[in-house]
Amino acid sequence: MTKSELIAQLAARFPQLVAKDADYAVKMILDAMSDALARGDRIEIRGFGSFALNYRPPRVGRNPKSGEKVHVPEKYVPHFKAGKELRERVDIVE
């Protein structure tokens, strides 16, 4: 599902919500989550999952084209861990 599909689905599910308002709401939620992660905060949505930053230490990598060694600096990467309820909901065994 893309962001525009999410907005369309919200507007269809809630007739009192104009598509423009759904777009604004989704944008504000995603901005708030991005800002929280940029500050180093953890985001927990009960029943859905949590977002946090994982630290990746500096390392020596290789340029795949030339085989030359390159220094890859340390960085933080966003990480999502699904909550128990979400894992159970998507674990459909037929």
Curated annotation (Swiss-Prot):
GO terms of molecular function? DNA binding; structural constituent of chromatin
Q: Which residues form a coiled coil?
A: none
One Gene Ontology term, aspect cellular component: chromosome
The record's listing under InterPro entries reads: Hist_DNA-bd, IHF-like_DNA-bd_dom_sf, IHF_beta
Cite a single GO BP annotation.
regulation of translation
The record's keywords, sorted A to Z, are:
DNA recombination, DNA-binding, Transcription, Transcription regulation, Translation regulation
Top-level division of the source organism's lineage: Bacteria
Database matches in Gene3D superfamilies: IHF-like DNA-binding proteins
- Pfam families from the xrefs? Bac_DNA_binding
Give the quaternary structure. Heterodimer of an alpha and a beta chain.
What does this protein's UniProt record list under function?
This protein is one of the two subunits of integration host factor, a specific DNA-binding protein that functions in genetic recombination as well as in transcriptional and translational control.
What protein family does this chain belong to?
Belongs to the bacterial histone-like protein family.
In Swiss-Prot or TrEMBL terms, this protein is called Integration host factor subunit beta
Organism for this UniProt entry: Azoarcus sp. (strain BH72)
